[in-house]
Amino acid sequence: MSNRSQFVPSWLVPEAAGDLPLTVSRLSLLALAAAFAVGYGAGFAVPLEVQAGVYLLGMVAMNLPHGGYEHFENLRRRAASFQGKYIVAYLVGIAAFGALFFVAPVAGLGLAVTVAVAKGGFGGVQSMDALYGTDHLRTRPQRWLAAVVRGGAVMVVPMLFWTDVFYAFSSVMISIFDPSAVSALGGDIATRRLVLGGGYGALVVAHLGLGYRRAAGTGSFLADAAETLLLIAYFALVPVVIAVGLYFPLWYSARQVARSSAVDDTAMTQADATGMLDALDADDPARATLASWAVLIVGSVATFGLAAVLWLLSPQPLGGGGILVGLVAFWSIFVSIIALPHVVVGGWLDRTRGIWYVP
């Protein structure tokens, strides 16, 4: 639990390393939430097709490169044996999660939601460690609570405020594999919302209450509380398709860039290790540039190759939706499949460094 609160920026004008992407993440979500709040008052509505286009722009063009960057940055300066095990574990995770969708799509969707919560939550807590400290989170259960609340905003809040759209897209996602399984989403949705909203609300109150009581006056609690409430407001006010599509590039990725800028990972370098990515650190600029290009190409081919395999194996790749809506559903499934090992292997099992490394 790193404590850098003494270097903490103010809420809007940080001074620590990584201050620019941190500020961008906050102002972006604040501006979007405010814009949609004003828009609703003026009777403005965004067509679903436009929302889908924004989602694809955010998740494919803006956010996908950062996911690859996280892995390559984590694997740089690591031994070849570790890199090999990492890649194998990653591919096994992808295969297992992909198989779950074909066998039990509803369970797969449930796990996908859990992965999104975990990625946003635990990745967020790690960025807090590096950027403004977490001295108000004094125990491991309290850190988990913070992660669930922050990550829960990504999925739970849209379920509460954008219920119809959330369930409609969930139905399309399930229909990619088995349209008959959609019936499992039926039932008393109003009661589910009540239970889900009550439970999440209690967790938010507990998180903020404990943080307030254990705050040490360094500013970390105030920053955490403000960001938590901002996330909740953002996902409540911004249409869910746009909200999710822009959250990952504008918030998650931006804050991980800020974390990377704020920490020094040179101490974790295995000086005597020889790995598959050593050429990236070559003294010869031409060789380093060529290696970077090769990594980009290999990563792109591998990613879209996996997407192509999923597309070809899926009984109904667009889930019965239109082109844009179907692509949003398909890409959401694909991203969740590759995100599972991203979180489990890259974030949790790699205890030496990991994609969210903070010394």
From Swiss-Prot:
Record carries keyword Membrane: yes
GO cellular component, one term: plasma membrane
Recorded GO MF terms: beta-carotene 15,15'-dioxygenase activity; carotenoid dioxygenase activity; iron ion binding
Source taxon at top rank: Archaea
UniProt note: phenotype after gene disruption: Cells lacking brp gene display a 4-fold decrease in bacteriorhodopsin levels compared with wild-type, whereas bacterioopsin levels are normal. Moreover, the beta-carotene level is increased by 3.8-fold, whereas that of retinal is decreased by 3.7-fold. Deletion of both brp and blh completely abolishes bacteriorhodopsin and retinal production, again without affecting bacterioopsin accumulation, and the level of beta-carotene is increased by 5.3-fold.
Example of a GO biological process term: retinal metabolic process
Record keywords: Cell membrane, Dioxygenase, Iron, Membrane, Metal-binding, Oxidoreductase, Transmembrane, Transmembrane helix
Keyword Cell wall biogenesis/degradation carried by entry: no
Membrane topology: Multi-pass membrane protein
Catalytic activity: all-trans-beta-carotene + O2 = 2 all-trans-retinal
Top-level enzyme category: oxidoreductase
Subcellular location per the Swiss-Prot or TrEMBL entry: Cell membrane
Role, per record: Is required for retinal production and bacteriorhodopsin biogenesis. Probably catalyzes the cleavage of beta-carotene at its central double bond (15,15') to yield two molecules of all-trans-retinal.
The family this protein is said to belong to: Belongs to the Brp/Blh beta-carotene diooxygenase family.
Name of the protein described by the UniProt record: Probable beta-carotene 15,15'-dioxygenase Brp
Organism name: Halobacterium salinarum (strain ATCC 700922 / JCM 11081 / NRC-1)
Species lineage: Archaea, Methanobacteriati, Methanobacteriota, Stenosarchaea group, Halobacteria
Gene for this chain: brp
